[in-house]
Amino acid sequence: MEITFLGTSSGVPTRNRNVSSIALRLPQRAELWLFDCGEGTQHQFLRSEVKISQLTRIFITHLHGDHIFGLMGLLASSGLAGSGQGIEIYGPEGLGDYLEACCRFSSTHLGKRLKVHTVRENGLIYEDKDFQVHCGLLKHRIPAYGYRVEEKQRPGRFNVEQAEALGIPFGPIYGQLKQGKTVTLEDGRRIRGQDLCEPPEPGRKFVYCTDTVFCEEAIALAQEADLLVHEATFAHQDAQLAFDRLHSTSTMAAQVALLANVKQLIMTHFSPRYAPGNPLQLENLLAEAQAIFPNTRLARDFLTVEIPRRTADPAIAMSTPQASPA
């Protein structure tokens, strides 16, 4: 389970940063989920290791252009009208109308493989055997939703050696024991599966909050997350701009991380005003956040972040981008 940042700038792209988009890779099922799709996102796919062919779900936070202007181009290029798997999109009310209008005026036909789910309230919006996705209404100028992806806990490792020592015959019975069930052997012995399994492995939690000013819903959504990606459009000294435009500062993002007891915070969605050469730069925002929540990082385009299993090293590993800057 890992994420790749495809865009980390707010409002407009810069020479080194595209606008918002994050890809969540689920390697165990060769599947890719996308969060937001700013202008140029499909170009970022081409410059990265993530594959459009694995894309199955897109989660849109809100309908501002820097989060959706790349959506139509990406969908048109993804082969929805032909063979291959479909794509399901989740987002605020109006997203379906936007896509319909784009298709109508551009004479684009996406076929029947696209399904749009309108998000209208907090709560569970998707679930399968491995994952749950919840959304929460944030505080922005238009309806904006944060998303929480939660992996379900996995059964603990089955102790085959112990089972063999007990004389349990290999076969379908092992599958029942792995599920923690109690089985009765032919000789009358009752074996509890839970006695042959290690403790269940907790699932991982990834939370994405943007665009928003500091709010209680972000804290609730991010509770105990392994990784929180939170917008930090402004520096602390520009807090009035954040309140006026309902965006977050670096210190607001850090406060959410602290109050939600997350493991790691990665800030994104930076205003171009902090680009290199300006009096205040992103390193200053990082220092502000780390003073509140030390385990904070800055996102950059093409950065890939692995979210390790809870039984692994608790430190989240960060790999070096392999692609050239956008």
From Swiss-Prot:
Cofactors demanded by this protein: Zn(2+)
Subunit structure as annotated in this protein's UniProt entry: Homodimer.
Catalytic activity: Endonucleolytic cleavage of RNA, removing extra 3' nucleotides from tRNA precursor, generating 3' termini of tRNAs. A 3'-hydroxy group is left at the tRNA terminus and a 5'-phosphoryl group is left at the trailer molecule
Entries under CDD domains matching the protein: RNaseZ_ZiPD-like_MBL-fold (cd07717)
MF GO annotations: 3'-tRNA processing endoribonuclease activity; zinc ion binding
Catalytic-site annotation from UniProt: D66 (proton acceptor)
Binding site for Zn(2+) 2: D66, H67, D211, H269
Annotated residues for binding of Zn(2+) 1: H62, H64, H140, D211
Gene transcribed to yield this protein: rnz
E.C. code: 3.1.26.11
Protein name, UniProt field: Ribonuclease Z
Entry keyword Transcription: no
Family membership noted in the UniProt record: Belongs to the RNase Z family.
Co-factor binding details: Binds 2 Zn(2+) ions.
Annotated function: Zinc phosphodiesterase, which displays some tRNA 3'-processing endonuclease activity. Probably involved in tRNA maturation, by removing a 3'-trailer from precursor tRNA.
Entry keywords, A to Z: Endonuclease, Hydrolase, Metal-binding, Nuclease, tRNA processing, Zinc
